[in-house]
Amino acid sequence: MTIAKDYRTIYRNQIKKQIRLNQEHLQSLTHLGSQINFEVDPPKLPDPDPARKVFFFDIDNTLYRKSTKVQLLMQQSLSNFFKYELGFDDDEAERLIESYYQEYGLSVKGLIKNKQIDDVLQYNTFIDDSLPLQDYLKPDWKLRELLINLKKKKLGKFDKLWLFTNSYKNHAIRCVKILGIADLFDGITYCHYDRPIEEEFICKPDPKFFETAKLQSGLSSFANAWFIDDNESNVRSALSMGMGHVIHLIEDYQYESENIVTKDHKNKQQFSILKDILEIPLIMDVEVYRPSSIAIKEMEELEEEGEAVNWSNQQINVQSS
């Protein structure tokens, strides 16, 4: 046995062991919100309702904080896969991971496009299914309270809370179960790692994936949707699709004078920048102020990218609650 094959065998055995531990943990969950109440793959699409309001939630680095370090765990998992399964050295693995993410929105899409893998579901097993999420995430009761209130009149009275993720369903559902919020969502739009390699693989920020989420949730008009994501490309795509309120979650964002930036976009859309998902109640009702230098910079950057921007700038004080 060569050294390379020996390392690969050790790597695969470690993956198998961790997946077994992950499955045992998932099956042991009994806390509030650890079970889903929706059908993951319903047999038919719901009828669109013109009055329906839907809030779309990204999962990774959104429903849990980036500072949990799950992203670093994912990056290490990706790096190991590129090294031990695909045979790249550390530098080349790092370069390809970043390059594919920037160009395609997901590293796996780059691997598919460049014919470097032939089994996407196996890739998912090595990457997301093997993550020891239970060592990094725990039930978030404040987040649970927020989600419950979003369906109440005082916080927008959304008809549906919808998971919208570039991950496969296994990882997505495991995350929300551990967080204790699985029972609060009405459905999920996820990337189909389980489809044949020759089929088109779509993910955010592809507009077709947004249309898929619209159909699956029964949303009639994007104007009736709210969307939150930590990825700038996904946020820009949501704005271009006409979503009613788009939130860019930037955990290390520096508010100017402790103000949250909320701005009116074209076609009565609104765009907000938040540091924490728990700040959502603060942008439900906003008062108009003069634009901050940060807001102006954001507008200029969007205009340079070709966005048709017609803002009236709004901010609210973080301490107002």
UniProtKB/Swiss-Prot annotation:
Lineage: Eukaryota, Fungi, Dikarya, Ascomycota, Saccharomycotina
Job of this protein: May be involved in phosphate metabolism.
Annotated source species: Saccharomyces cerevisiae (strain ATCC 204508 / S288c)
Signal sequence annotation: none
Family: Belongs to the SSM1 family.
Cited Pfam families: Hydrolase (PF00702)
Induction (UniProt): By low phosphate level.
GO molecular function: lysophosphatidic acid phosphatase activity; nucleotidase activity
GO BP: any one term: cellular response to phosphate starvation
Domain of life: Eukaryota
Note: Present with 195 molecules/cell in log phase SD medium.
Protein name: Phosphate metabolism protein 8
Any one cellular-component term (Gene Ontology): nucleus
